[in-house]
Amino acid sequence: KWVGLVYQRMTLISDGGDAPISSLSGQLSPAEVNMDLTMCGLLVDRAEELAQLYADKGNWNDVKEIWFDERLSNRSTRGSSQKIYRVLTSRFKNAPTSLPNPSVLPRVFDQCDTSRDKAQILYLYLVSDDSLVRYVVHEYSARVSRGEPDPLDFSNETLSTILGNLTYSDGSSFDYAESTTERWCEGIRSVMREIGVLEGQQTVVGDSPSVGTIPLLVA
């Protein structure tokens, strides 16, 4: 249920007055947090391809074999393909039961009108799987709920402040190299562009996007 609430808050959809979503700061362990978003964003086309393979084959071992055979025949590097495969399949494998099983996603995608609709659905899998993205989305949801000016400001400055406020359950703090953090910030902006929060490559302050009918049903 919280996934739907987060999506509602981020997109300013009325949620019937539910209690504010609490911060995840202090609740996550360092082991739960990673920078996978620096490797790949939503990658709608590739995620759709993986979901179709899984729907066809029914198991991830066959999907992996076919995926790498096709990548290598297209002269992709194995290292790059492995990273993308690991990150994208993790989002599917760790999805809560409240989201569609990846085996039925191709049918869900067939009902989508636009690539943005598909991105808005894949965003839910990302938020469910990636603890750092989830923490940041919770913080932005709180900014929207509090009525802050420019609540959806995804500038490096605002993002860095939010990331810097993250403390782990063991008392330690978020601590990554500045260059890595900047790549992560660009990654989250890329996601926000794909789901319609940010418009244009240079825009860093967003607005509530229109949400497609199918993404709303999924959320």
Residue ranges of predicted features:
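Short amphipathic alpha-helical interaction segments
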Residues: 80, 178-191
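Eukaryotic partner-binding/assembly regions in large regulatory complexes
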Residues: 11-132, 136-139, 145, 154
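Surface-exposed cleft-lining segments at the edges of enzyme active sites
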Residues: 170-178
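DNA-recognition alpha helix
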Residues: 154-171
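Acyl-donor binding region in acyl/amide transferases
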Residues: 148
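Accessory, usually C-terminal, subdomains that scaffold auxiliary metal cofactors
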Residues: 179, 193, 197-219
